[in-house]
C-alpha cells in the first residue's frame, strides 16, 4: 500500500511540479517560488538547489526510466557544468543570478560535496564520462584545499581563504566544523565510489566514517553532536533529530557500497542505537520533532526531517526486523500525506508545519534549500527497498 502511494506521489506530483520550473531561457531551473506560489523568474539560482535537482532527475531516471527525466537531468547538468563550476580557482560557486552569472563566489565544502553527489549520479544515469571527470575534479579540490590537521574546514572565499562558516551555523552559534558537512561528504564520496570504485575515494570515505564514529557520535546518549570548533571541541548543545535519522541510513549505505564487513557490522550496530533513540525521544503525534537546543524542543514539522524519518525507520527495520520501526515509518508517511503535502493547485510540499498542523507561510515552496532531493529521494528509496506496509 505505502509503496504504491509513494510511487504515485513521485510520478504524479513531485516530478510534474519540478518539470514546470525548468528555465529554458537562461538555463537551469527557476530559483524561487513563494509560499503563495508566486514564481520569481529573476531570483538567484542556488547551486545547492541545482545539484539536488540534477541528483533528483538522474535518480528518477534510473528508478523509473523515461526520456523526459534524463533530458531534465541533462538540462541541470549543463547549467552546473557551464555556469556553476569555477574553472579558474576550483570548486563551485555558492549562488548564481537568474542569468547564470556568479552572485556569490563563496566556496563551501558542503556545497561542493553536493555537486560531486549529483555529477556522480548523472554519470551513472547517462554514461557521460565528462560528468565523472568533473566529479573527480571537485573531489581533488576538496582534498587539496579544505583539510587541516583535524579534518575538513568548510567555508572559504573564492580563492580558498577561510571565512566565517555562516552558511551552516544557526541558533546564534558559529561553528568551524559541522556534522552536517561530514555527513554530506560521506554521501557524496559514497556515490562517487559507487560510480567508479576509486580506492583513494574509498580511503577518504573511511576517514569520514571514522570521524562520525569516533568524534561525532556520543555513545552515552546515542546521538550525534552538531557543531564544533576547528579542533572538534563541541560548540553549543544541539541535537538535530532529522540529521540523526538521515545519518543512520547514509552511513549504512556507505558501508554497503564499500563492502567492508567490519565497518558494516560496526555501523549497523551504532545506527540502530541512534534509530531507537530517535524513535524514543523525537517521534511525537505521528511525526518527527525538529531538534533540541539546550532544554528547548522545537516541535516544528520540517519537510525534509519527515522524509528522512521514513527512509531511516525503514532502514532500521531492514537491519533489525523490529516491526516497531515499520510502524513508525508508516505513521510519519500518514502525517506527510495529511499535513506536509501541499494540496493546493501548483503546490508541492510545505517547508514547515507547526505542531498543530499550520503551515509556516513565511517559508518558500522553492528556494536555495527547498528542493526535490529529500522528498524525491524518500520516494525512490521506498520504491527500490521494496518494503511495504
Swiss-Prot record:
A GO molecular function held by the record: cellobiose epimerase activity
Known catalytic reactions: D-cellobiose = beta-D-glucosyl-(1->4)-D-mannopyranose
Family per record: Belongs to the cellobiose 2-epimerase family.
Any one Pfam family match given in the protein's UniProt record, by short name: GlcNAc_2-epim
Lineage, opening ranks: Bacteria, Bacillati, Bacillota, Clostridia, Eubacteriales
InterPro entries on file: 6-hairpin_glycosidase_sf, 6hp_glycosidase-like_sf, AGE/CE, Cellobiose_2_epim
Keywords: Isomerase
Full protein name: Cellobiose 2-epimerase
One annotated GO biological process: carbohydrate metabolic process
EC category: isomerase
PANTHER family xrefs: N-ACYLGLUCOSAMINE-2-EPIMERASE
Gene3D superfamilies, alphabetized: 1.50.10.10
Stated role: Catalyzes the reversible epimerization of cellobiose to 4-O-beta-D-glucopyranosyl-D-mannose (Glc-Man).
Assigned EC number: 5.1.3.11
Matching HAMAP family: Cellobiose_2_epim (MF_00929)
Disulphide bond pairs: none
Keyword Magnesium: no
Keyword Ribosomal protein applies: no
Amino acid at each position: 500500500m505505502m509503496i504504491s502511494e509513494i510511487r504515485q506521489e513521485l510520478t504524479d506530483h513531485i516530478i510534474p511540479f519540478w518539470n514546470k520550473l525548468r528555465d529554458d531561457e537562461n538555463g537551469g531551473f527557476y530559483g524561487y517560488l513563494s509560499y503563495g506560489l508566486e514564481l520569481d523568474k529573476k531570483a538567484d539560482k542556488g547551486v545547492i538547489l541545482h545539484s539536488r535537482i540534477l541528483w533528483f532527475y538522474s535518480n528518477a531516471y534510473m528508478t523509473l526510466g523515461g526520456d523526459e527525466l534524463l533530458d531534465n537531468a541533462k538540462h541541470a547538468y549543463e547549467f552546473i557544468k557551464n555556469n556553476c563550476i569555477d574553472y579558474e580557482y576550483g570548486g563551485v560557486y555558492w549562488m548564481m543570478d537568474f542569468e547564470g552569472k556568479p552572485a556569490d563566489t563563496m566556496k563551501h565544502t558542503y556545497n561542493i560535496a553536493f555537486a560531486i553527489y549529483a555529477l556522480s549520479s548523472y554519470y551513472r544515469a547517462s554514461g557521460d564520462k565528462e560528468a565523472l571527470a568533473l566529479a573527480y575534479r571537485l573531489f581533488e579540490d576538496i582534498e587539496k584545499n579544505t583539510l587541516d590537521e583535524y579534518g575538513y574546514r568548510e567555508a572559504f572565499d573564492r580563492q580558498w581563504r577561510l571565512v566565517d562558516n555562516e552558511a551552516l551555523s544557526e541558533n546564534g552559534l558559529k561553528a568551524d566544523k559541522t556534522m552536517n558537512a561530514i555527513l554530506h561528504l560521506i554521501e557524496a564520496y559514497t556515490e562517487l565510489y559507487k560510480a567508479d570504485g576509486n580506492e583513494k575515494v574509498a580511503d577518504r570515505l573511511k576517514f569520514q566514517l571514522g570521524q562520525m564514529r569516533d568524534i561525532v557520535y556520543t555513545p552515552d546518549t546515542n546521538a550525534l553532536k552538531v557543531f564544533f570548533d576547528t579542533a572538534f571541541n563541541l560548540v553549543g548543545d544541539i541535537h538535530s533529530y532529522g540529521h540523526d535519522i538521515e545519518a543512520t541510513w547514509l552511513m549504512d549505505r556507505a558501508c554497503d557500497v564499500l563492502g567492508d564487513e567490519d565497518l558494516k557490522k560496526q555501523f549497523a550496530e551504532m545506527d540502530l542505537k541512534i534509530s531507537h533513540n530517535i524513535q524514543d525521544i523525537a517521534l511525537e503525534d505521528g511525526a518527527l520533532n525538529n531538534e533540541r537546543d539546550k532544554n528547548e524542543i522545537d516541535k516544528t514539522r520540517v519537510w525534509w526531517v519527515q522524509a528522512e524519518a521514513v527512509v531511516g525507520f525503514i532502514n532500521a527495520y531492514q537491519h533489525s526486523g523490529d516491526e516497531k520501526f515499520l510502524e513508525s515509518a508508516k505513521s510519519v508517511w500518514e502525517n506527510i500525506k495529511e499535513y506536509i503535502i501541499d494540496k493546493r493547485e501548483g503546490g508541492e510540499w510545505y517547508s514547515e508545519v507547526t505542531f498543530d498542523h499550520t503551515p509556516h507561510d513565511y517559508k518558500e515552496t522553492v528556494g536555495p534549500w527547498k528542493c526535490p532531493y529529500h522528498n524525491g529521494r524518500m520516494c525512490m528509496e521506498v520504491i527500490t527497498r521494496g518494503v511495504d506496509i
